[in-house]
Each structure stands twice: as C-alpha cells, then as structure tokens.
C-alpha cells in the first residue's frame, strides 16, 4: 500500500550545514514527506543515482562546490526534479541566476518553517500537476502517431499486433529510434484484455543499475542510505496490466537474472526486503539494438532474450514507408497550426519533394519535430523548404544508397550527431530527439560524442 509520503513526494535536501539539514528534515517529515539529505555535491549525485526525487532544496554555498555547477549536474541527472535554491541575503543575485539556469524558486536564509512548508507544498503540487498534464498530452498527442499507414509492411505489423494483443504472450518490438515502438506498445495494451488496468513504462537508458532495481521492484525503508520510506516498484504498479520495458537493450546486465526470474515465475523481492511477492504482469519490450549480437558479445542474456521474443514485431523505418510521409506531415501540420494559432495550411511542392527525398533517420519522431518547428516559424499559407531546415538536394545526398547496409546504432549515432550540430543547446537537442537530457547524456557517452 502506498504511504502518505509516497503520495506527497520525495524531497532531497542539499546543504553543508548539519543544523539546517536537521531542522529542514524534521519540518518536512512532520508534514509526511519522504526526505533524504546530502551535505556535499558528491553525496547528492550518489543519491540521485539511486533514487528518484520530485523536489530538491539546494544551498548555493556548498563549501568548495559551486551551487550553480551542482544545479547544472542535477538538470542532467534528474531533469524532471524541481529545484528550489536556498541562499543568504547577500547572494540573492546569484539565486536569480540559478532560476535562469533552471531552478524554480528561491528561499532566503533564515527561512521560517511555514515558508519551507509552503514552498514544498507549492512545488510538489506543480510537479504532480505537470506530470499529469504531460501524461495526458503525451497520450493525446501520440495516440496512433505513425500507426495509421498505407504501407503494406506496416499494415502487416499492425495486423499481427492486433492478433497477439488478445493473448498474454510477451512481445518484443524492434525498430529504429523514433519509428513508433512506444506507440505500438500502447496500442497493444489498449487492444488487450488488460486495457482497463495500468500500462507502466520504464525507460531503461535513463536509470542506473542501482536505481533500476529500486524502481522496478521497489525498496523497503532503510534498504540503503536515504531510503526513509518503503516504496512500490513499477512491477507492483502494473499488477494486472502491462509493463513496457522501453529500450530493453540498455537494461543492466547485472539485473537481468532478476528480471528473467520475474518473467518466468511472476515473483520478486523489494530491495532490502526478503518477502517474496507476486504480480500478474504482461511484458512488452522494445529496442533499436541488435540483441542477438549483444548476446554473442556477452552483453545480454540469451535466456532472457528467449523469454522476451515469444512474439517479435519489426517496425519498418519511415524511409521504407514512403507512401506515409506526406500524410503524416499533413496530419502533424494540422495539429500544430491549431495548437500554436499559426497561418500555415499546407506544403509547397518543393517542400513536399524534400520530405519525400529525405531519409528520416529519426523516423516519425523526427518528422513530427520538423513539422512542429516549421509550423511555428512559417508566417505564410504554405510551408516551404526553408521552414523544414533542409533542401531536396541535401535530402537526396544524405539518403542511404541502394544496397548500403547501416546498423541501427550507426543510424542513431548519425541522427544524434546531426541534431546536436543544428541545436543551440543540449536541452534543445534532447527535445528535438524526443528524449530527456539524461538519456541524451548516456547516448553521447555510448557513441563517444
């Protein structure tokens, strides 16, 4: 059962003064919040690797550590977390700089318990509302994106997906980044007999091995430093429904035996708790990586792969669904001009030709982002090539040659490189790619970018 603190949110306090940490912690725990403390930047970083926090109170003066640098690292590690700066009167200007860098508010020392409680309640309410709004917007915006198709290859995949959705068979969805794996997983859940139960998603690249085990199976109070309350895992949250493991190729190798056991026996233990629990969960997984090659290289367990790929669905990349490109573009344009109140109503012939020729390494996600940008900057009735950000000639020259074989990793690396080159900041690049900042950080590290 979810505790009060789990419902209200998890808070991280970062301050090098133990008396302030103690006072803040007692005040917030009295309100029922789950609170963890860190007295230095390395301690805070270690906690963020193990736990998910909704809110952080960060002191700008952390001994030798620069609070703005700590804030920047937090934005990479936990971009969803709201950060409130705590500062002295003499550093208010720096607090304003911190807000421009991503903090959401600041408190001036000494602050009263009422000020602290009010700030926590306000920011956690915003966090909860934002999460709900993002979930609703994501569901509405992505419902069926890229799944409606005139392509025979895509139609065959959808027909198979509808047939197997009615069963409880595990399904592995293969496809390049942005090809619609998440949308297909959502559709399969909707078509299944589990549709009235939750579909819970874990984005595997965004979690470290330590955090993954806690997020997947939950943990008990005192299981590790900072674990002040017991938490439910995603497995428990998905009981009766569907667990979607997005980018399963990035699932930590050290945890794969525990995942295998859960898939086989439906049994698991929370971190720090010997009690064996059960959950009735259907597993969907997706990846843009070659799991067979990873098995051969010792990077993925063969027995786990056999459990995951009972049914395999291969999503074709957008460049192999040429008949769908313009239809998707028109649908996206109609949506975005309505959202933003822009004048565009269609595409020039040059723009249509450029979209036909472009290889779309980022697939449907890239097409959606390109059209969103074009709808915003276009001040006329027809979107032209300049609004798309590429020309027909450039599109043709960048398209894969017939017979050329590129791995999914090569395509993803090329796509990420191109997007970063055309983006002013890494945050902008992550948004264009449709991933969060921490996932982009891991991808850059993976590909040496």
Swiss-Prot record:
DNA-binding residues (ranges): 426-445
Name under which the protein is recorded: Alginate biosynthesis transcriptional regulatory protein AlgB
Tree of life domain: Bacteria
Alphabetical GO biological process terms: alginic acid biosynthetic process; negative regulation of single-species biofilm formation on inanimate substrate; phosphorelay signal transduction system; positive regulation of cell motility; positive regulation of DNA-templated transcription; positive regulation of proteolysis; positive regulation of secondary metabolite biosynthetic process
Any one GO molecular function term: ATP binding
All residue ranges annotated as the Sigma-54 factor interaction domain in the record: 147-376
Record keywords, A-Z: Activator, Alginate biosynthesis, ATP-binding, DNA-binding, Nucleotide-binding, Phosphoprotein, Transcription, Transcription regulation, Two-component regulatory system
Description of post-translational modifications: Phosphorylated by KinB.
Cellular component annotations (GO), alphabetically ordered: protein-DNA complex
Pathway stated in the Swiss-Prot or TrEMBL entry: Glycan biosynthesis; alginate biosynthesis [regulation]
